[in-house]
Amino acid sequence: MSDQINEYTKPKGLENVGATCYMNAVLQCFYHVKPLSSELIHYNFPNLSVNQIPMTLAFLDVVKNLSSGNNNPARPILFKNVISVNPLFTGIQANDSKDLILYFLEKIDQELTFLNYFSQNKFFFNAIKTMPKVFKPELQYIVELFMTNHKSIFSDLFYGFMKQTITCSKCHQELTNYQIFNFIIFPIETVYNSKKNNNKNNNNYKNISKSTYSPYNMPPAGKPSYTSNSEYGNFYNNYNNNNKSSNIYKNANYGSYDNNNKSVSLIDCFENEIDDINFKGDNQIYCNKCNKLLDAKGKNIIFSSSHVLILILNRGKANKFECDVEFEEDLDIKKYVENKECPTKYKLIGVISHLGESGMGGHFIADCRHFDNKWYCFNDSIVSGPSNHYNKKGIPYILFYLNEKYI
């Protein structure tokens, strides 16, 4: 096996070990995050077993097998066995790549934090230096709490901070919350309707994904907030059994995708995400200065961006909303990031696409920018390419963007 990853590393497929196309697509995209794979391939845990750090060793096994010199597809049976302890990923029913990404990031970050395996980036602490002084104590507390519980290359690369400012309509007091995210979900139907009707949705902040450190008791202005760690708990164990199917290819349709002339851009998605939020009616905000529920306005912005942006183009499960999403290989989000010292320019490195009429079944593939800077399509064990640019196949579902300095 090779002990390094570079432009000479050959692209390899992954065997389907039982309706695992959703898993293989995710693994290919994470593997093609070069700063991640390049560091992990040197990790060695001689005194630890798969029972102690199962997700870490399973992913490391994938990285090393995909980096080996032979041309045979890698067999990710260890990874499949590890995720099968979660009922959501047991058996051969249809599964969603998004759910695996969430579960994978949570578990492997926990394991590496426990081992204290972390890089020296200290990205989040550097972000504090440019924070307005009035908010520094609040943010510093959240950052330090975060860094206590997340000490791995995954938290360094994939995690960022979202900032929300809420202004009371009566006293105009501003309250600022910070939430940690490791991917962002864009509701495509909402984005399309907002663009079409110029009537923005007022509830998009719920689409930020990840356990968050968010104030549950709004403090007076300028005072530190008190935080609670809102975890997913039994989300996976309580997953809707109706999402299961005995055959993942049941609803597959490999024909052309008719978008009915509906389209939005990735920039439209970001615009919708940071647009003003109106808290009215049942969504009123409690103002501790006015001592009652009142209308309020909110504003979202990315405070500190992550080195890897994972963007979910959510079209629904049972009946996918048919709308083309236009995106480029080069992405600049400077307009949507408050801390300009954070990454704002990215390169597209991976696209997970869905083939099929319904989100309840179908087939997942991954297109990735390989380490030779060429694009390849990974359809389980079949690898096609190379190409100089990403070529759309199926319906793009999950986008991976990497800080351009790592390309």
Protein language model regions, located:
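Carboxylate-rich, divalent-cation-coordinating active-site regions
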Residues: 21, 168, 311
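Exposed substrate/partner-binding surface patches
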Residues: 1-9, 30, 40-50, 65-69, ...
